Amino acid sequence: MCNVYSKGFIKSGMLDENGREAFSEITSETKNKIDVHRSKNEIALIVTKNNRVIYGLESLLAIIGNSFPTLEKIARIKPFHWFFQRLYKFVSYNRKQIIPSEKDLTKDNCVPDFNLKYRLFYLAFVLLFSAYVLGFYNQRLFPNFKNNFGLEFFICCMQILWQSAFMGIYLKDRIWDYLGNMMTVSLLGTLLLIPALFFNFSQVFYFIYFGIVVFIMFLEHLRRCRILKFGIIPTISWMLFRITFGAILLYIVSNS
């Protein structure tokens, strides 16, 4: 994920083309200048004029401030700075769950420390956001059914509990990495559903589109499990949950 915004800074001219160095490729000279462990949690910026090193949000503000000094001043106002500091940590501690990499399992990886608080915040954020959007989407699938948010919230909670129960035994100490990636798959599916809510298509269309989105989520779930070497079992369990609770949902709706 660091690559995403560092490349963005380069393309926008806020950072020199040679001003970026991938964590897995840093030289011994750079390692001697920075706190390697800290830089896994907070991106490091070396100010070449005086060899001063700044980390995390401060490094981003320094880069932005070179091109947009007013934005930097606004971001440093206490309430805003407090918010952006938490937002930075929220993204940083969960960035490998948002965009995983095969390099995450290598020796010279840049995987941040595990922070339970921010991982739980991430799971809760995706859970609430997904339940909210799916509540609206369910109205397109089942126009006569009420309490869509409550039902979707329950299903999203059950998905976490289901996978935690089964995968906790299989993945053991890697369960939190899996849950973060699983919820990112849910977030992807939720985002794909949103555009369809701005139009009024037929009920059949919404069922077909929902099926397409679930298939995309299935492929993404497989891809992430392959990258992180979780194996096929998490995907099988994930699909069993979808099928089981999909059948339960249809039963509830048809008898409501």
Which residues does each PLM region occupy?
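Thiol-based oxidoreductase modules, predominantly thioredoxin-like and allied folds used
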Residues: 14-31, 40
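Hydrophobic core of alpha-helical transmembrane segments in multi-pass integral membrane proteins
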Residues: 124-133, 160-164, 246-247
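Alpha-helical transmembrane segments forming the membrane-embedded cores
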Residues: 135-239
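Local sequence-structure signature of Cys/Sec-based thiol-disulfide redox active-site neighborhoods
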Residues: 1-17
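Thiol/selenol-based redox catalytic cores and closely related redox-interacting motifs
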Residues: 30-140, 191, 195-205, 209-228
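Final/C-terminal transmembrane alpha-helix of multipass membrane proteins
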Residues: 233-256
